[in-house]
Amino acid sequence: MYAYDPGNPREFIDGQVYAVGFTWDKDNDPAFPPDSNGAVSVLVFDSFKGKPTWASVGPFLSQYAKLYPFMDSLFPPGLGDPQVYQKNIRAFESVLGLPIEDPRYMPVTRDMSRDKRKVLLAWIKAGAPG
């Protein structure tokens, strides 16, 4: 299976989700009735070529603040404020730098593209300038 940049169809959320159906030769065997739930969800991310500046990362971090308002209670005044990252550089570097398989990986929903994560980490490593 191959996937290509979907071109940001959902604007504020990375990528596009596709359901891919499949069958196998046992589907014709009465002992193995077809399963109508036989599908694989595939998340294909759009590319992101922003620079490691607040102007580039701010819009998608503000979207995360809207999607996950609970995080604002952990980091007042909220994820949409660059000072939050400036004050918590080590914490954000550690969770954003983990392998995606790690349960502590952020965002926990695994819905941030590799490109945006790379730019975000570069911005944080630069001191999260506002």
Per-range role (PLM):
Residues 2-130:
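Aromatic- and Gly/Pro-enriched helix-to-coil junctions and flexible linker segments
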